[in-house]
């Protein structure tokens, strides 16, 4: 099932994509797509719905109908750095002995096709297509063997990054990762039953039609079950939390010479089975 949120920013309503690619309104069924709605029992009830019996929403999704972030009220957007060995190499860094964990502030989250703002003073804004893992059943100290039932579904995250803020200006990575609009999410949450193997998904990203990133989740260093277990040692995972699992090679700072995003350029990215995103870069 593909769960989504449609409408103007801040006024999104819950919806689902039907078999014909049209949006059906779930407002009479749930208040939004997030929190307890993502618990396993709640998702099972949504999957059992006859979507054809629900109101049809006018407009074509991602064209005449805006989609918002696919998860509402995200409590935590937890990111994993250097989780593809070939990306670590292009960044000139070693594969870490444990996952590199950082945060994206939830104020960075926007819809899949909303504009991305290049921050004032930025000279090194970059792109990163990533697989997002949406937590359904929360927990602490989750065993790796028990991790997958905690997943509600998957989505695309563009982990937009400002490399000077992130790397060159001391402190943690967070200030180069959490700028407003740096977390496009969606277009929809694909429930876990429709993604039999999250480690076998092709992913890509283009800038102005040029392919920069092309990879597969198969080359992750730390796989989804391990990441869930690992993170749960340090924090409670809660329904609606999102784990952004790292990016394959092809980011701007890894080019020779490096290239970075400029206002007026367009990013187009996707992951097999999870849809696509398109963002115009604008100056903040």
Model-derived features: where do they sit?
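N-terminal non-catalytic cap/leader segment that marks the start of a structured domain
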Residues: 1-99, 268
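Catalytic-pocket segment enriched in acidic/His residues
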Residues: 5, 9-10, 66, 70, ...
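N-terminal accessory regions of nucleic-acid-interacting proteins
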Residues: 140-154
């Amino acid at each position: 099932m593909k769960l989504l949120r449609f409408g103007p920013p801040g006024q999104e309503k819950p919806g689902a994509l039907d078999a014909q690619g049209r949006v059906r309104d779930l407002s009479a069924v749930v208040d939004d797509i997030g929190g307890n709605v993502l618990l396993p029992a709640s998702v099972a009830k949504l999957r059992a719905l006859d979507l054809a019996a629900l109101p049809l929403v006018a407009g074509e999704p991602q064209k005449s109908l805006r989609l918002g972030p696919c998860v509402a009220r995200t409590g935590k957007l937890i990111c994993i750095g250097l989780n593809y060995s070939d990306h670590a190499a292009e960044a000139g860094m070693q594969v870490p002995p444990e996952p590199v964990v950082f945060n994206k502030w939830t104020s960075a989250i926007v819809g899949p096709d909303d504009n991305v703002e290049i921050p004032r003073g930025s000279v090194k804004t970059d792109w990163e297509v990533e697989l997002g893992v949406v937590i359904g059943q929360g927990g602490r100290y989750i065993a790796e063997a028990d991790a997958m039932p905690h997943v509600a579904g998957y989505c695309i995250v563009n982990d937009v990054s400002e490399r000077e803020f992130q790397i060159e200006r001391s402190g943690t990575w967070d200030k180069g990762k959490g700028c407003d609009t740096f977390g496009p999410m969606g277009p929809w949450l694909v429930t876990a039953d429709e993604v039999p193997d999250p480690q076998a998904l092709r992913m890509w990203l283009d800038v102005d039609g040029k392919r920069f990133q092309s990879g597969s989740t198969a080359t992750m260093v730390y796989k989804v079950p391990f990441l869930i277990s690992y993170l749960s040692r340090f924090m409670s995972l809660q329904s609606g939390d999102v784990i952004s699992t790292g990016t394959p090679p092809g980011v701007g700072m890894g080019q020779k010479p490096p290239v970075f995003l400029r206002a007026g350029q367009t990013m187009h990215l996707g992951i097999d089975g999870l849809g696509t995103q398109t963002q115009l870069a604008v100056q903040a």
